Design a protein with these regions (language model features):
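Active-site-proximal loop->helix
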Residues: 1-41, 127-131
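Short glycine/serine/threonine-rich phosphate/pyrophosphate-binding segments
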Residues: 1-3, 11-15, 60, 85-95, ...
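Hydrophobic beta-strand scaffold residues
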Residues: 2, 25, 49-50, 150
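Generic beta-sheet signal
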Residues: 5, 28, 51-53, 118-120
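Beta-strand segments within the central parallel beta-sheet cores of soluble alpha/beta enzyme folds
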Residues: 5-6, 80-85, 110-119
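Buried hydrophobic positions in well-ordered alpha/beta secondary-structure cores of metabolic enzymes
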Residues: 18, 70, 82-83, 115, ...
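Active-site/ligand-binding loops adjacent to catalytic centers
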Residues: 30-47, 101-160
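Active-site/ligand-binding-proximal alpha/beta "capping" segment
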Residues: 41-106
């Protein structure tokens, strides 16, 4: 049996692919942070796994493929700049990791890529921390129509 907890107002296009496994979909009033908090509580009570994308190594490692594609398209040259959207921060951390790994494998020269983080104006805890030079990311209440970026308490934010 599979349960998928989602924000109740999530776009149907983000849900459809999951329906192929015939899960029980539970809409939660609130944003991704509210859903994550509830799932953490449920996993603490029941013997259920909480497979959040920020906690799954396969998702995180899969994020590196973005840079692999970019490097291939640029003839195995690292770009000067990358502008990446950030929700939980994993894409940013894995972009850095993938460039380093390609260099360690001898497939590219040492990258001098500058990575720029983009977040929605109403939900920018990582960008705010970077601008302020903070040591940790302060959670915010998301206020944006960009639901995929509406993570007010980003799991990998401090590493981005």
């Amino acid at each position: 049996m599979c349960f998928i907890f989602i924000p109740a107002d999530l776009e149907i296009g983000k849900v459809v692919a999951s329906l192929v496994y015939a899960p029980t979909v539970v809409g939660i009033t609130g944003n991704y942070d509210d859903v994550n908090r509830l799932c953490s509580e449920i996993a603490g009570v029941y013997p259920w796994a909480f497979a959040n994308i920020n906690l799954r190594p396969f998702y995180a490692e899969g994020s590196k493929t973005l840079c692999f594609e970019i490097l291939e398209q640029l003839g195995w040259q690292a770009p000067d700049h990358l502008i990446l959207p950030a929700a939980g921060g994993s894409l940013v951390t894995k972009a850095k990791k993938s460039l380093k790994e390609f260099h360690l494998l001898g497939l590219i020269d040492k990258p001098k890529t500058k990575i720029h983080v983009a977040q929605a104006a109403g939900c920018g805890p990582i960008v705010t921390t970077l601008k302020e030079g903070g040591d940790f990311v302060k959670p915010v209440k998301p206020d944006t129509i960009a639901k995929s970026l509406a993570i007010g308490n980003p799991a990998d934010g401090i590493y981005a």
